Amino acid sequence: MVTHLEVCIDNIESLHYAIAGGATRIELCSSLALGGLTPSYGFMQQAAKQSSVPVYAMIRPRQGDFFYNEEELDMMRWDIEAAHQSGLDGVVLGVLTQEGDIHIPFATALCEFAQALGLGITFHRAFDQCRNAEQALEDIIHLGCERILTSGLAPSAPAGESVLKSLVEQAQGRIAIMAGAGVNADNARDLVKNTNVQEVHLSGKTTRPSQMTFIAGQSKMGASDVDDFAIPITSTQAIANVAAALK
């Protein structure tokens, strides 16, 4: 039985759409196109004010790998503090060594700091870049995290079903395994049935056109292939379809 349908969002508009679709928890990010980075303090504050379901903030200071230095560790501490001050329910984090193991000193520092503030912890898909998933699972359990977000080390959760099933069996209820990456209404039911995961994670993304009446075509705000006047948002229907498939 699925206990949580988590939706990742990167704007406040999507918060309302995700909850309307049946999200039971929100992962709050910026820049989902980069895999999700730390949201702003203002976004955390507004989400805490508006949400009727638990909200966990992504704690990821930059794009790229999950091997961080001391300065970045300090930044993550400040961001965890911001999540607490905003009234959020938890944080989502992950730190690795250069060799692809859980960075025990850094992970311990971050987890103990978050736990002392009363925040729940999800270990994110840095797990999927570990060299030894079985050992990483035990390390994360020892850290006291509530769950691991993982695709089963594969490009998508459906492709990682066999590993997801093994992780659930190894965990034996000591930690939740949350399947994420490529989850949709067409595969969610079979994914849960085949792996016994109790939590699933998705973005349910679509886009809407800009509401501006003047469209400037002479400049770009970022990459040339990104349409500045197409706003990525969560599709309420996409989330509702997954929720229905899981009933």
Swiss-Prot record:
Gene3D superfamilies in alphabetical order: Copper homeostasis (CutC) domain
Main subcellular location of this protein, as a coarse class: cytoplasm
Name the UniProt record assigns to this protein: PF03932 family protein CutC
Pfam families: CutC
Family membership: Belongs to the CutC family.
Subcellular location: Cytoplasm
Protein keywords: Cytoplasm
Entry keyword Zinc: no
Organism (species): Vibrio parahaemolyticus serotype O3:K6 (strain RIMD 2210633)
Family matches, as InterPro entries: CutC-like, CutC-like_dom_sf
GO molecular function (one): copper ion binding
GO cellular component: cytoplasm
